[in-house]
Curated annotation (Swiss-Prot):
Protein name: Pyrroline-5-carboxylate reductase 2
Family: Belongs to the pyrroline-5-carboxylate reductase family.
Gene: PYCR2
Lineage of producing organism: Eukaryota, Metazoa, Chordata, Craniata, Vertebrata
Oxidoreductase listed as a keyword: yes
Annotated positions binding L-proline: E164, A237, T238
Organism whose genome encodes this protein: Macaca fascicularis
GO cellular component: mitochondrion
PROSITE patterns named among the record's database cross-references: P5CR
Region (Disordered) location: 295-320
Length: 320
């Protein structure tokens, strides 16, 4: 099995790093494409031994499972570009927020009658094999296609199948969730520094507290509120701290954050369905389209980071 990733940003790096760390796909069986070859993530992928190219078509050609790991506004252009190269063997996995299965299928069905499409929402902790992933099956995707994707994503964290109409809510919760956690951790560390702790120690203690709390919850059958109560001694420091959080609307802020992310995802979906994008996204789309339509299709191989080659990548004929 070979894996292609269109896009070479943070998600692409996280997926490649997770898959190789899990041993489910070797680096030489992964190919990623990007119009920009000077990105930090591209350098990191190159160091891992991942095959790199500027050509999205080449990525399709040398993959069985194809991840679309680009921003939602660029998906239509990507599909127009690669549609003729997608074959019956390909499983096309869209990771773009708000991009529906039907919109991807509609584009690809201009080139073939039954494209196998799966919509996926994951998050960046797949890089340390602690990701949270859900997926929904497209009209023509087979049971074994879903099983293959679940095998891949389960190797880098939690993975389960859901109905597509739940994915927007998942985006608001676990898709955006790591950012909430990082912001909370940064604030906790600031609190520690305010009280006299060195920054490095404050960050480490805060991160360990969040990690330990998450593991306690996942390893038990207790409700989060019960675990919270277990930390609170009558009249103690923790219950006073929780009272302060409650008075500041801590719970409501988190609930509203999940809702805001979900609503924005639905707005992106509506804009995509109507083929409308924001002015800022339009400007970026035009720039990206120029890069996509560039005649240069040279390949950067991991073994020669400074040398451009025009030959095809040899990813091996045998399937894992």
């Amino acid at each position: 099995m070979s894996v292609g990733i269109i896009g070479a940003g943070q998600l692409a790096y996280a997926l490649a790093r997770g898959f190789t760390a899990a041993g489910i796909v070797s680096a030489h069986k992964i190919i990623a494409s990007s119009p920009e070859m000077n990105l930090p993530t591209v350098s990191a992928l190159r160091k891992m031994g991942v095959n790199l190219t500027r050509s999205n078509k080449e990525t399709v050609k040398h993959s069985d499972v194809l991840f679309l790991a680009v921003k939602p506004h660029i998906i239509p252009f990507i599909l127009d570009e690669i549609g003729a190269d997608v074959q019956a063997r390909h499983i096309v996995v869209s990771c773009a927020a708000g991009v529906t299965i039907s919109s991807v299928e509609k584009k690809l069905m201009a080139f073939q009658p039954a494209p196998k499409v799966i919509r996926c929402m994951t998050n960046t902790p797949v890089v340390v094999r602690e990701g949270a992933t859900v997926y929904a099956m497209g009209t023509h995707a087979l049971v074994e296609d879903g099983q293959l994707l679940e095998q891949l994503m389960s190797s880098v964290g939690f993975c389960t199948e859901v109905e597509e109409d739940l994915i927007d809510a998942v985006t608001g919760l676990s898709g955006s969730g790591p950012a909430y956690a990082f912001m909370a951790l940064d604030a906790l560390a600031d609190g520690g520094v305010k009280m006299g702790l060195p920054r490095r120690l404050a960050v480490r203690l805060g991160a360990q507290a969040l990690l330990g709390a998450a593991k306690m919850l996942l390893d038990s059958e207790q409700h989060p509120c019960q675990l919270k109560d277990n930390v609170c001694s009558p009249g103690g420091a923790t219950i006073h701290a929780l009272h302060f959080l409650e008075s500041g609307g801590f719970r409501s802020l988190l609930i509203n954050a999940v809702e805001a992310s979900c609503i924005r995802t639905r707005e992106l979906q509506s804009m995509a369905d109507q083929e409308k994008i924001s002015p800022a996204a339009l400007k970026k789309t035009l720039l990206d389209r120029v890069k996509l339509e560039s005649p240069t299709v040279s390949t950067l191989t991991p073994s020669s980071p400074g040398k451009l080659l025009t030959r095809s990548l040899a990813l091996g004929g045998k399937k894992d």
